C-alpha cells in the first residue's frame, strides 16, 4: 500500500508473512515485488524485499534505488530544505555505509577520499567543490545533505542513484557496499 509513514510515494506490503508463506517452497535470496500501477512510488526494506511500481515512467531508476536499500542497506542520499524531523542525530554515526555524521568517518569512505580532496572534508576548498557538476557520481568527497536532512548528514558524491533518479549509476561508495555483500554471499565458506 502507498502512504507508508504518511508519504504518498512510499510503497510497502502489509502482507509480508503471507508473501513468505507463498514463497516457502521456492529457493530465494531476495524478493522484488512489482505493483501493476502507474502511480509513482516504491520501497526497499533491508534484507527483506524491494517493492516498486511497474508502469510508471521512472520504474527503472526507482527499482534500482529501492534495491540499494533492500539488498545493500543503503540510505537515501536526498534531503529536504524544509526538514521537520531529524532522522539522524548529529552525535550518532548512521549504520548505513553511504552516509555519515562525521562521528566515525573512518568506518565509512575516508579510505576512498583522494588526498587532494582531503581538505574538502574540513571545508577549506569550498570553491573546488562548487566547480563539480551536480550530476557527478564519481568525484568522492564529503557533501552536506543526505538522509532527508540538509545539514549535519553527508554523502560521498554530488549525485548517486541513492540521491536522484537522474543519476547514471551508484556512486563508488555504494558500489563498494554492494560488491562487499555480493562477495560475502559468493566467497567460499558462505
Show where each model-derived region lies.
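Active-site-proximal segment of zinc-dependent metalloprotease catalytic domains
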Residues: 1-82
Amino acid at each position: 500500500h502507498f502512504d507508508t509513514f504518511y508519504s504518498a510515494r512510499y510503497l510497502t506490503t502489509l502482507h509480508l508473512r503471507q508473501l513468505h508463506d507463498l514463497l516457502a517452497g521456492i529457493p530465494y535470496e531476495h524478493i522484488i515485488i512489482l505493483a501493476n500501477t502507474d502511480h509513482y512510488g516504491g520501497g526497499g526494506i533491508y534484507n527483506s524485499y524491494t517493492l516498486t511500481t511497474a508502469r510508471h515512467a521512472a520504474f527503472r531508476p526507482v527499482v534500482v534505488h529501492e534495491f540499494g536499500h533492500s539488498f545493500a542497506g543503503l540510505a537515501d542520499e536526498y534531503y529536504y530544505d524544509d526538514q521537520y524531523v531529524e532522522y539522524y542525530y548529529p552525535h550518532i554515526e548512521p549504520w548505513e555505509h553511504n552516509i555519515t555524521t562525521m562521528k566515525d568517518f573512518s568506518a565509512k569512505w575516508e579510505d576512498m577520499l583522494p588526498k587532494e580532496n582531503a581538505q574538502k572534508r574540513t571545508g577549506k576548498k569550498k570553491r573546488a567543490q562548487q566547480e563539480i557538476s551536480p550530476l557527478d557520481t564519481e568525484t568522492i568527497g564529503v557533501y552536506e545533505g543526505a538522509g532527508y536532512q540538509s545539514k549535519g548528514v553527508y554523502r560521498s558524491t554530488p549525485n548517486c542513484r541513492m540521491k536522484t533518479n537522474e543519476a547514471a549509476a551508484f556512486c563508488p561508495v555504494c558500489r563498494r557496499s554492494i560488491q562487499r555483500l555480493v562477495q560475502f554471499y559468493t566467497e567460499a565458506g558462505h
